[in-house]
Curated annotation (Swiss-Prot):
Residues 17-324 form the SAM-dependent MTase PRMT-type domain. S-adenosyl-L-methionine binds at H30, R39, G63, E85, E114. GO terms for biological process: chromatin remodeling; DNA repair; methylation; negative regulation of DNA-templated transcription; negative regulation of ubiquitin-dependent protein catabolic process; regulation of DNA-templated transcription. It catalyses: L-arginyl-[protein] + 2 S-adenosyl-L-methionine = N(omega),N(omega)-dimethyl-L-arginyl-[protein] + 2 S-adenosyl-L-homocysteine + 2 H(+). It comes from Danio rerio. GO terms for cellular component: nucleus. The active site is at E128, E137. GO terms for molecular function: histone binding; histone H2AR3 methyltransferase activity; histone H3R2 methyltransferase activity; histone H4R3 methyltransferase activity; histone methyltransferase activity; protein-arginine N-methyltransferase activity; protein-arginine omega-N asymmetric methyltransferase activity; protein-arginine omega-N monomethyltransferase activity. It comes from the Eukaryota. It is found in: Nucleus. Its EC number is 2.1.1.319. This is Protein arginine N-methyltransferase 6. CDD domains: AdoMet_MTases (cd02440).
Amino acid sequence: MSQHATKKRKLDRSTEDYMYFDSYSDVTIHEEMIADTVRTNTYRMGIFKNSKSIEGKVVLDVGAGTGVLSLFCAQAGARKVYAVEASSIADQAVKIVKLNQMEDRIEVIKSTLETIELAEKVDVIVSEWMGYALLHESMLNSVIFARDKWLKPGGLILPSRADLYIAPINDVVVEGRLDFWSTVKGQYGVDMSCMTDFARKCIMNKDITVNPVTVEDVLSHPCKFAELDLNTVTLEQLRDVNGSFSCVCFGSSSIHAFCVWFTVTFPAEEKALVLSTSPFKAETHWKQAVLYLDDAVDVMQDTKVEGEISLYPSEENSRHICIRVDYVIGEQKKHSKSFSIPDQYLEVK
């Protein structure tokens, strides 16, 4: 996929892993995740709704962090839970497990998933593997590895499915920032309107921006462009998760960007449980991934926005995601733009 990215320094895998696991060694990220009530409550409910499949069974928690999901599984009746966590937060997980008197049922393993050896196959895999735009951090790769090596035939994966969505959006904040430069003369007597183009290039750049998007900013119904079945998806398929989209605008506005989000689904006997990061639902710590066009495009009621979108690993750091969008808005010609996680996240600390 060399056509997708500008060539930069490629990090070796050990450096990628060090950066990734080191980022989970501080309390801040765990506070953010556990304080996300949508995330944590949905996982708790998803686990308890599958208690019949968990009770008396063996569970593998991939990327266990503080061990909260392992504890939910133990509370749901699991006989044994292997909580695998490679970062130093595993030391805190051991303390939390002990504090909750679950040492006899939860074993915290401080190691990468790919290097562990378990005494037995597992009945259930649970993992909170999702990153920004679903695939950032590529933790799903470890879940697939665990599935292929450790999960019994017919075993359960929680969550079991993921879906990706896209929609065009308006951004009044960006609009205001661009308009600002035309107001400077009226305020200070100095014309700085020539800064508008420079500001546009700086703001509407090639970064994947993680921001909350309000319902009012979304200009069409969401369009699902990809679905991942965790029981069958392969590592090869994750090298390029792609799909097409076709949206119809609600009314007159300006498209500044595309917005990408995801859902994951927990199976249940009656009604499946969905964890959604949609702008139409309560905000989560994942927010939404915003992909800015080079220039805003004016649209009217029923203007069609069509195209293809592809998510793939960065050539410089395989744990980081890149996104390419090829799109046509109304009668305009086809445009293409590639996006990546900002450079500061690629640097070794």
